[in-house]
Amino acid sequence: MSGDRDDKRYPYPKDDAELRRRLTPMQYEVTQHAATERPFTGEYTDTEDAGIYHCVVCGTALFESGAKYHSGCGWPSYFKPIDAEVIDEKMDYTHGMTRVEVRCNQCGAHLGHVFEDGPRDKTGLRYCINSAALNFEAKPEWK
C-alpha cells in the first residue's frame, strides 16, 4: 500500500468484518490493501457496454463508459472520472516506482493508478483501474 489509510478521513464508514463478508477476496485485497489484479484478467477489461462504473465498496459513481478506452495495458482505462470530486489521488512510492494512486474519495478504497499517457485529444490521462474495485451498472438507453 502506498500509505497509511488513516492519514485521511473518508466520509463513508467501513466495517472490516462487513467488508470481508460482502466482498470477494480479490475485491477486498485490491480495495483495502492496494493489491493489483493480473493484467487482462479483470471482469471489465474488455467491457464495451454503456453505463456507469461504481466503487465496489461504497457505490459511488466513478467513471462513465464514454470515458473508457482500450489502452492495451490489461486493465480498464478511462481518460477522466465522472467528476473530479469522486477521486482522491495520493503519491505512491511502492515497488521502486513513483506513481499516483487513485482512491475513492468517499471510502478510501484503492482503485488503481493514474498516468499521463492517455489520449492526447482528450485529457492526456489514463486512469488504470482494477475491475475488482468496480461494479458496473448498465445503461443500454445510452447507446
Curated annotation (Swiss-Prot):
It catalyses: L-methionyl-[protein] + [thioredoxin]-disulfide + H2O = L-methionyl-(R)-S-oxide-[protein] + [thioredoxin]-dithiol. It comes from Burkholderia thailandensis (strain ATCC 700388 / DSM 13276 / CCUG 48851 / CIP 106301 / E264). The active site is at C128 (nucleophile). Pfam families: SelR. HAMAP family: MsrB (MF_01400). GO terms for molecular function: peptide-methionine (R)-S-oxide reductase activity; zinc ion binding. Binds 1 zinc ion per subunit. The zinc ion is important for the structural integrity of the protein. This is Peptide methionine sulfoxide reductase MsrB. One of its GO terms (biological process) is protein repair. Keywords: Metal-binding, Oxidoreductase, Zinc. Zn(2+) binds at C55, C58, C104, C107. It comes from the Bacteria. The keyword Repeat does not apply. Belongs to the MsrB Met sulfoxide reductase family. GO terms for cellular component: cytoplasm. Its cofactor is Zn(2+). Residues 16-139 form the MsrB domain. Its EC number is 1.8.4.12.
